[in-house]
Amino acid sequence: MEKPLYPSQYMRITEGYMKGSHRDSYAIDDAGIDQGIDYLKAPYTGVIKKIYQKDANEIWLESIEPVIYPDGTVDYLTMLFAHDNDISNLFVGKVIAKGERFYEEGTKGEATGNHVHMECGKGKFTNSGWHKNNSGHWSINNAKNPTEC
C-alpha cells in the first residue's frame, strides 16, 4: 500500500475549495512556483480511467491498489486533474508509477493563467467520474476534502 504524495513540487493555491468557481466542491487550483508551466508527478501508482478533451483536458487517475489516507483508513483513491495544454502522451488504461512525471499546468479550458485544477475522490472511479453540483459546476464523484487525501 502506498501513501499518496502531493503531486506538485511547489504549492501555491490560487483558488481553494468551497469558494469562487469551486463553490460546493473540494477542488483546488495550484499554480506552482510562478506563472510558468510546472509539471506534476503521480501521487500514487495509478491507471488513467477517463480522459475528457472537450473542455480542459481532464483526466481521472485511479490508484491501482488501496492507499493509506491521512486518517489511517485504507481505500482506493481517484484524482481528477485539469488544464494541461497537451495530453497527447496520455491514454485510458495507461499505468503511471508513483513519482512519474505525467501532467503539466496549463490554460486549456476556462482557465486564467497556468495552473492545475485538482480534486480527489475516495474509492474507485464510478459512473462518468463526475456530476453537476448544486452550483452547476462539474465535480468528482465521492469527493473528499483535499486535506483528507
Q: What is the role of each PLM region?
A:
Residues I33-Q35, D86-L90:
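Short alpha-helix capping/helix-loop boundary micro-motifs
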Residues S25, Y76, G113-V116:
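Short edge beta-strand segments in beta-sheet-rich domains
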